[in-house]
From Swiss-Prot:
Keyword hit for Lipid biosynthesis: no
Gene expressing this chain: rpsB
SUPFAM superfamilies assigned to the protein according to its UniProt record, in alphabetical order: Ribosomal protein S2 (SSF52313)
Superkingdom of source: Bacteria
Ribosomal protein as UniProt keyword: yes
Any GO BP: translation
UniProt GO cellular component terms: small ribosomal subunit
Entry protein name: Small ribosomal subunit protein uS2
Pfam family, one: Ribosomal_S2
């Protein structure tokens, strides 16, 4: 990780100082023009700490679940998680998905059956259109779970404010949570805090690339 790359990015620029969450205060080094500025050293330490845990997960051949339900992050999380063959949710989160693994497994099996039906010539055009609609709906909601056979070891959440339900489910199951947190976020429930400008796609890309470099 080269410091110059971080300095040249906007990764260290936090939100307005009046919105500072006390739990994130230890990651702030000073303010400029009323903006909180993250300590680059602490960003690096936080990222490397999570990278060490991710290495352990890969070594044990366990899974990491990516969450990117917020429009701002959706495309990035979708493409990145697929590129490293990890499960993801980039649309609506179905409550209980973590606590009831059998439900999404059933939906993935249903998706496979529907795709087989679409290939059969014996079905009418109307029936095939109906199958295609069902296929699309299931794919959007459950397609990202395809690579998830059991409870993930880590969940990386792009926006904890949008996905509070997932945070609560993960805590009940004692699943580790990592998240990209700005200076206004509450980090009290997060195991691996990634302090950064989470309003910047570039910041998230930089961190993800560092975390998974030489692992995939």
């Amino acid at each position: 990780m080269k410091i110059i790359h971080l300095i040249n990015s906007d990764i260290f620029i936090g939100n307005n100082k009046k919105f500072l969450n006390f739990s994130m205060k230890k990651y702030i080094i000073f303010t400029i023009n009323n903006l909180n500025i993250f300590d680059l050293k602490k960003i690096i330490i936080s990222v490397l700490l999570l990278k060490k845990y991710i290495k352990f997960i890969y070594k044990k051949k366990m899974k990491i679940l990516f969450i990117g339900t917020k429009n701002f992050f959706r495309e990035l999380i979708y493409k990145f998680s697929r590129s490293i063959r990890q499960p993801f949710v980039c649309n609506k989160w179905i409550s209980g998905s973590l606590t009831n693994l059998q439900n999404y497994k059933k939906m993935i099996n249903k998706l496979k059956i529907i795709r087989k039906k679409i290939k059969f010539k014996s079905y009418t055009k109307k029936e095939k259109i109906s199958f295609l609609k069902k296929e699309k709906k299931i794919e959007i909601l459950f397609g990202g779970f395809r690579n998830l056979k059991k409870t993930p070891k880590l969940i990386i959440i792009s926006d904890i404010n949008k996905d509070k339900i997932i945070v609560n489910e993960a805590k009940r199951l004692k699943i580790k949570i990592a998240s990209f947190l700005d200076s206004s976020d509450n980090c009290s429930k997060i195991d691996f805090i990634l302090p950064c400008n989470n309003n910047s796609i570039n910041s998230i890309k930089i961190i993800l690339n560092i975390l998974f470099k030489n692992l995939c």
